[in-house]
Amino acid sequence: MNDINLNEKHFLEHETVLKSINKYTKKKISRAAEIISKSLKNKGTVYWCGNGGSASDSLHLSTELIGRFNKNRKPLKSVSLASNSTSLTCIANDFGYDKIFSRQLEALGKKGDVVIALSTSGNSENILQTLNQAKKNRVYSISFLGKNGGKCKDKADLEILINSKSTARIQEMHITIGQIICDLIEKKLKL
C-alpha cells in the first residue's frame, strides 16, 4: 500500500466512525456539558484521567478549561489526575498502578465534582477503580470508552461509547467530543 492509499484508508476510517455518532450519543455529549457546567457553576472541580494517549487527552482537555477554549475568560477548576508525576509514581510504588487515579480522587473529590475517565478499551483497572471511587465520594462520573466498553461499561453515571476497534479512531473521537463539551461549557456558563 502506498502512502496516498494509506492516507485515504485512515481518512475513510475516521469518516466512518464520525458518521456513527448518532443522536443518542450527541444527547449524551450535551448532557455531559450540562452536568459539568452545573458543577463548575457551583464551585465544583472537574477531574480527568486516562492512560497513554488518553492521559495526554485528559491533560489537553483539562487545560482547555483552565486556560481557554474559544474565548478569553476566567479559569475553570479542572485537574488532570495524570499530570502529577510525583503522585503517580508514589501511588504506583506504594499502592499499585491500579490506584494511581482512584487514590487521588479519594483525597480530592467531593460531592458536586465530576470525573471524566477516558479509556479506549474500557479494560484499564485504574479507570475502573476510579469510577468505583467516584461513587464512594459521590462524584458524578462520565466515561469516554471505545470498542465494546470493556469492564468499565455501565460503571459510570454517564457513558459515551465510540463503536470502533481502532485505538487511533477512538482517541480522535474522544478528543473531538471533549472539545465539543468545552465549547458547550463556555456557552452554557455564558463566559
Regions found by a protein language model. Name each.
Residues Y24-N42:
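A short, well-structured juxtamembrane/interface segment
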Residues V46-Y47, S141:
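Hydrophobic beta-strand scaffold residues
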Residues M1-Y24:
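Generic N-terminal amphipathic, Lys/Arg-enriched alpha-helix
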Residues S54, L59-L191:
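Glycine-rich phosphate-binding loops that contact phosphosugars or nucleotide phosphates
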Residues V17, N42-K43, K111, K155:
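Structured helix-beta-strand junction loops
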